[in-house]
Structures are given as structure tokens and as C-alpha cells.
């Protein structure tokens, strides 16, 4: 829901400025939920991946196994976030009954920051896909239908303070996800 022009992680109070239809529909959903007056927790997240379905991690595993060379965008910064970490956080909040009286918007991503390029290099290294050469490129060199924010870091102070969450680092979670993928294959 943000435009990506910030230089510090976005707080929940930062003014939204979606760059594409996806961001606009996410913001519209938040606004519709808030307008109902219901007691809701709205969680914003970014750069989700898991061992299921299509996502960046699984795409990089496939490409680095199949190709000798790929280019990956290096000028977009965010936090790779394992969907299992988000699910566990939501489960602990709901199961513990910690949400009563704490309605509102919260940010949740794993800890740390990377570019898509850095994340791709880490995925390939951890998976042993050393034969694929990964090179950085600019967003402008990799056109997509939807404009993407250059900076997607979310400030997690509020969710940590409100719910006492311990948030894992993205690298630990990536390794865990890769282990689960390997085990399931």
C-alpha cells in the first residue's frame, strides 16, 4: 500500500500511496473493513514465500537449477517473509486472546532486509545451485506490467510491543522452508 519512496521502515501511521492495482485493492480492503466498525486486526505484510504454490523462492529454485545465468532486480529492498512465520504469529495472537481491545492495523514481516537479487543469491547458495550465475539488474531493465515499490520495509515495533512477538530473521526462515521443501520432495 506504500509508494516505496521512504528511507526508513514504514509505520502503520504512514500515509499509503499504492503504486499499482494490487496495492490499491489491498488499501480499499483495509478501508472497507475499517468502515464497518467491526473489531478487526488488519495485518500488512510483504514479500511472502512458502513451500507451497508459486512464489519468488520456488521460482528462483527452479530457475537456478535450470539455467546457467539469470538477472534479478537489485534496486528493490524488502524483507523476505516466510508465510509460516506470519501464520504462527496470527495463530498465537488469536489463540492467546491477545487481540481483544487491540484492533487496528499492524505490520508483520520477518526481520532483516535484502534486495530481490540478494535473496536470490542466498536461495541458490543454500540450495547448492552454484552453477547458475546470478547478476543484478535494475528495475528499469526488467519491465513488468505493474510498477513495484523500490522500498518495502515495514516497521514492526507496534506488533512486537502490542503482542510480545519474537520475529525470526528471514535467513533462518528461508533455511527452514528449504529444509521442508527438500523433505517433502
Task: State what each model feature region is.
Residues 20, 78-81, 114, 154, ...:
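Residue-level signal for the nucleotide or nucleotide-sugar donor/cofactor binding architecture
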Residues 31-78, 84-92:
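NAD(P)-dependent short-chain dehydrogenase/reductase
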Residues 22-26, 53, 79, 116, ...:
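Conserved donor sugar-nucleotide recognition element shared by glycan-biosynthetic enzymes
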Residues 170-185:
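Amphipathic terminal alpha-helices
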Residues 140-162:
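A hydrophobic C-terminal alpha-helical subdomain
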Residues 56-58, 83, 87, 116-120, ...:
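A general structural signal for well-ordered alpha-helical segments in protein cores
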Residues 1-43, 48:
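Catalytic helix-loop patch of NAD(P)-dependent Rossmann-fold dehydrogenases
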Residues 89, 96-146:
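Mid/C-terminal beta-alpha module of Rossmann-like enzyme folds, strongest
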